[in-house]
Curated annotation (Swiss-Prot):
Molecular function via GO: acylphosphatase activity
Endpoints of the signal sequence: none
Gene (name only): acyP
Protein name: Acylphosphatase
The organism of origin for this protein: Geobacter sulfurreducens (strain ATCC 51573 / DSM 12127 / PCA)
Stretches assigned to the Acylphosphatase-like domain: 4-91
Protein keywords: Hydrolase
Active-site residue list: R19, N37
Lineage: Bacteria, Pseudomonadati, Thermodesulfobacteriota, Desulfuromonadia, Geobacterales
PROSITE patterns to which the protein is assigned, alphabetical: ACYLPHOSPHATASE_1 (PS00150), ACYLPHOSPHATASE_2 (PS00151), ACYLPHOSPHATASE_3 (PS51160)
Length: 91
């Protein structure tokens, strides 16, 4: 089953290549969507794909790349919309 997830990652998640590594993980898992920095220092992403793949990407977000310190991940599950063909960084 395909799903959509909106995640907000809090902690030391900007300036540590979090977005770059999220793109790599999403491409490896076959997940589409986007990731972006938020003004307050958080990172937000929208992930779409097979439930198992999206869940794996969300699980990865709980620790992120080695230089990140993730304090909290806020997850909102939504119905799959099929909006994206690939995964990219939004600005």
């Amino acid at each position: 089953m395909k799903i959509r997830a909106i995640v907000t990652i809090k902690g030391l998640v900007q300036g540590v290549a979090f977005r770059h590594h999220t793109v790599q993980q999403a491409q490896r898992l076959g997940v589409s969507g986007w990731v972006k920095n938020l003004a307050g220092g958080d990172v937000q992403g929208c992930f779409e794909g097979e439930e198992e793949a999206v869940d794996a990407l969300v699980a990865w977000c709980h620790h992120g790349p080695s230089r990140a310190r993730v304090d909290r991940v806020i997850l909102e599950r939504e119905h799959y919309r099929g909006e994206f063909d690939d995964f990219d960084v939004r600005y």
